[in-house]
């Protein structure tokens, strides 16, 4: 039987209009039709936008699962031997490992092993819970005891999707479990949320890392942390009965809010979770932070999620801080160059105890010198130098200087690198910054003429030690004309005249008013007529001693005609005339 053809939507186009254009009713109906069509278009656009977001969201989830599956399909096969259920009694775990009923299934299951199931030998079998009808879930099908099949519309993505259909199976129905007393049952609800939702908890423990192709499937599924443990964070509290249902609903609500932050940049959701962390219920805080942990790296790089992670640092236990520290270390480079992730790293340097930041700084050093010159990561380095962690700085600066040897010139002439260099000058010990200072002063001729490097030289002149100042001032006098007429170097010369008035001012005036190589021309004339140097001469004529002003005025009078006719010399000519009176 053929299907009836679907009637096309006419969007009101079938509305018959009078043929007389001058009819008032014609105009009214035309306006009505236009408004009707506009309303339809507006509603359709809203639906399309909403559908597009949902479709994109689902596509992202599918792509992530496909990527994980392609990397190692074996890690998606369910577990068969020695499940090692941490929440079960030891005797129960042993019996389950020997007497697990497996149903036939395809190998394409998307249920990821629970983090509480480790050291597994995988076969091409899937294990699912028992349904209310005493059925086993396999590939989306209930197989009843009478042989009939009841199909699921979709394969459950995790045990969460099927937990409403799960009931306790009486273990006294068979003779396979002699140690259990009669009429005893296992209720998954009593085992806690971690057992009910292995898919989500596996990501909480394993993060985004999947076993590489070729790795043994017997590999422990936990991260191994620097302290030698395999627990990434504290387990959520185990509840039972109705409390667990309420607890599961709370976890689901938190996850939904995290999803809103990640996919929709929802500021309100971020603020709401931050507010919940401020309550006095320590248990709720631990559970909330444990729920956030699996998504921590993604949230760190999110516009509003990064504030949530920073707030988590303030309320985390030591174990949770260590978990965050592990993720920070693993992704330190990508976080440091991210606009929002860099803020999280800066916060960690402020709030973390020193034992947590050792490895973090070591990883940052391996990314040198690129991270010193990047727009966002440079602020992480500035925060590190400003924290003045004595135990860290003493041991790390040797490694830091060795890594940066021969690269300070490149860093000093960059916009962000020059800021980091000045921060080092302000906050580090003399022995730690000596390598940097020597390399910069030795390459001063290239740095001083740079748009950003000139600020580094000015900083040394203003705040450096006396020997370093003298080395720079001597270099300025050797190339006095060149530096005084350069766009950026002239700023350094002016800064030296203002800061080192006693030691440098007289030497500079003498240098620019003394004829060179027995020629009548002097540097003062060239500097006064230069578009950048004329500001230096103006400053000299205003603050010099009377004898120095008279000396410079006598030299400049000889060139008054050219000064008055020059765009940049008119102001100097006026000052010379003023000095006469």
Swiss-Prot record:
GO cellular component: cytoplasm
Pumilio repeats: 291-326, 327-362, 363-398, 403-438, 439-474, 475-510, 518-554, 555-581
UniProt keyword Repeat, yes or no: yes
Biological process terms in GO annotation: meiotic cell cycle; nuclear-transcribed mRNA catabolic process, deadenylation-dependent decay; post-transcriptional regulation of gene expression
GO MF terms held by the record: mRNA 3'-UTR binding
InterPro entries: ARM-like, ARM-type_fold, PUM-HD, Pumilio_RNA-bd, Pumilio_RNA-bd_rpt
Gene3D superfamilies referenced in this protein's UniProt entry, alphabetically: Leucine-rich Repeat Variant (1.25.10.10)
Domain PUM-HD residue range list: 225-580
Protein's UniProt keywords contain Transport: no
Keywords of the record: Meiosis, Repeat, RNA-binding
Signal peptide: none
PANTHER family hit by this protein: MEIOTIC PUF FAMILY PROTEIN 1 (PTHR12537:SF189), RNA BINDING PROTEIN PUMILIO-RELATED (PTHR12537)
Functional description taken from the UniProt entry: RNA-binding protein essential for meiotic progression.
Name of the protein in its database record: Meiotic PUF family protein 1
Gene that encodes it: mpf1
């Amino acid at each position: 039987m053929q299907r009836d053809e679907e009637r096309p939507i006419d969007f009101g186009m079938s509305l018959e209009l009078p043929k007389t254009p001058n009819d008032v009713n014609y105009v009214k109906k035309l306006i009505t039709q236009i408004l009707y069509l506009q309303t339809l278009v507006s509603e359709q656009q809203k639906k399309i936008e909403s559908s597009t977001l949902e479709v994109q969201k689902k596509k992202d989830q599918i792509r992530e699962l496909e990527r994980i599956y392609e990397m190692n399909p074996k890690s998606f096969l369910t577990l068969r031997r020695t499940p090692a259920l941490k929440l079960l009694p030891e005797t129960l775990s042993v019996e389950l490992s020997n007497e697990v009923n497996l149903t036939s299934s395809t190998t394409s299951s998307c249920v990821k092993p629970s983090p509480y199931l480790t050291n597994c030998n995988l076969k091409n079998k899937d294990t699912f819970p028992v349904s209310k009808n005493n059925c086993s879930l396999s590939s989306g099908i209930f197989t009843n005891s009478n042989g009939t099949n009841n199909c699921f519309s979709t394969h459950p993505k995790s045990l969460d999707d099927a937990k409403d259909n799960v009931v306790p199976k009486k273990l006294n129905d068979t003779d396979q479990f002699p140690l259990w007393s009669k009429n005893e049952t296992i209720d998954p609800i009593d085992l806690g949320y971690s057992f009910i939702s292995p898919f989500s908890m596996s990501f909480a423990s394993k993060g985004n890392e999947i076993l590489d192709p070729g790795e043994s499937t017997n590999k422990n599924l936990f991260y191994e942390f620097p302290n030698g443990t395999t627990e990434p964070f504290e387990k959520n509290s185990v509840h039972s009965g109705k409390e667990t249902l309420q607890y599961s609903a709370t976890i689901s609500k938190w996850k939904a809010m995290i999803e809103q932050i990640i996919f929709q940049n929802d500021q309100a959701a971020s603020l709401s979770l931050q507010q919940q962390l401020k309550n006095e219920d320590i248990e709720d805080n631990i559970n909330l932070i444990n729920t956030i942990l699996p998504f921590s790296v993604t949230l760190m790089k999110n516009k509003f999620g990064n504030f949530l992670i920073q707030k988590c640092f303030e309320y985390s236990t030591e174990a949770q801080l260590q978990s965050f520290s592990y993720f920070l270390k693993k992704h330190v480079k990508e976080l440091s160059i991210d606009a929002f992730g860099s803020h999280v790293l800066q916060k960690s340097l402020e709030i973390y105890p020193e034992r947590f930041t050792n490895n973090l700084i070591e990883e940052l050093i391996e990314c040198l010198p690129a991270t010193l010159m990047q727009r966002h990561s440079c602020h992480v380095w500035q925060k590190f130098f400003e924290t003045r962690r004595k135990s860290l700085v003493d041991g790390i600066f040797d490694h830091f200087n060795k890594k940066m040897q021969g690269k300070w010139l490149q860093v000093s002439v960059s916009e962000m690198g020059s800021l980091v260099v000045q921060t080092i000058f302000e906050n580090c010990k003399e022995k730690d910054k000596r390598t940097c200072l020597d390399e910069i002063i030795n390459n001063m001729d290239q740095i001083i003429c740079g748009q950003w490097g000139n600020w580094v030289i000015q900083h040394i002149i203003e705040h450096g030690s006396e020997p370093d100042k003298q080395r720079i001032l001597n270099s300025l006098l050797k190339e006095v004309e060149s530096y005084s007429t350069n766009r950026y170097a002239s700023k350094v010369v002016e800064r030296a005249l203002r800061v080192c008035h006693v030691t440098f001012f007289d030497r500079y005036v003498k240098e620019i008013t003394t004829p060179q190589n027995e020629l009548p021309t002097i540097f003062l004339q060239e500097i006064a007529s230069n578009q950048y140097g004329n500001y230096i001469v103006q400053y000299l004529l205003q603050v010099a001693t009377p004898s120095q002003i008279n000396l410079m005025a006598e030299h400049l009078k000889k060139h008054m005609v050219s000064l008055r006719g020059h765009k940049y010399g008119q102001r100097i000519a006026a000052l010379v005339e003023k000095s006469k009176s």
